[in-house]
Amino acid sequence: MIRLFQLYEHQLKVRPKLTNSIMTGALFGIGDVSAQLLFPSGPDTLPPSAQTNDVKRGKYDIPRTVRAVVYGSMIFSFIGDRWYRFLTKVKFSNKPAKHWSNMVLRVCVDQLGFAPLGLPFYFGCMSLLEGHGLGAAREKIKLQWWDTLKTNWCVWPLFQMVNFSLVPLQHRLLAANVVAIFWNTFLSYTNSQIPVGGHKLTVQYPPTVQ
């Protein structure tokens, strides 16, 4: 494990964008695999528009995992990297960069800025990757956005305080993605128990796809 992390550190210095892309995609894929294996979707847990033949038969949904990897590696890895670099510049002008007040400010900017906007962006991307239009994205946002955001605020602010305080900049996206594996699995389970519009919808952020 130590040697693997050392290899990751070396590649991060030599090829930072490619390394972040591969690692983020892999962790998103792992999150989707764990969610599907622990809490498989069936016809009673998804709306009719999301029911494929494989889902109806209770089979593992490979395209869903592929979409998770594609979104993580080709979209979110670059957005997340730029966002964390931007957050390091967010600070009060009269306070040292490492002052506790700046850490609180960064968490507030992250949770009140990125989180509310990241959800509709994610649902829009997933709808396109699934072959649906923006109408499906609007439906997902209407059903899932507020409850998902409230749950997000119960989990991520505390982690981000630790992330911004103790984790080096180059590892913050990795740390967030590792925690997101457990976050997606937990959120998938809790929200699959809540009936929405006559169906049970699995809600995940960010970002395990369905």
Curated annotation (Swiss-Prot):
Please state the protein's primary subcellular location: mitochondrion
What is its subcellular localisation? Mitochondrion inner membrane
Q: Where are the transmembrane segments?
A: 22-39, 68-84, 112-129, 173-189
Query: What membrane topology does the annotation report for this chain?
Result: Multi-pass membrane protein
GO CC annotation = mitochondrial inner membrane
Q: Which cysteines are joined by disulfide bonds?
A: none
Which keywords accompany this UniProt record? Membrane, Mitochondrion, Mitochondrion inner membrane, Transmembrane, Transmembrane helix
Keyword Membrane found: yes
**What GO terms describe the biological role, i.e. biological process, of this protein?**
ethanol metabolic process
Name the family the entry cites. Answer: Belongs to the peroxisomal membrane protein PXMP2/4 family.
Task performed by this protein: May be involved in cellular response to stress. Required to maintain mitochondrial DNA (mtDNA) integrity and stability.
Q: What is this protein called?
A: Protein SYM1
Organism classification: Eukaryota, Fungi, Dikarya, Ascomycota, Saccharomycotina
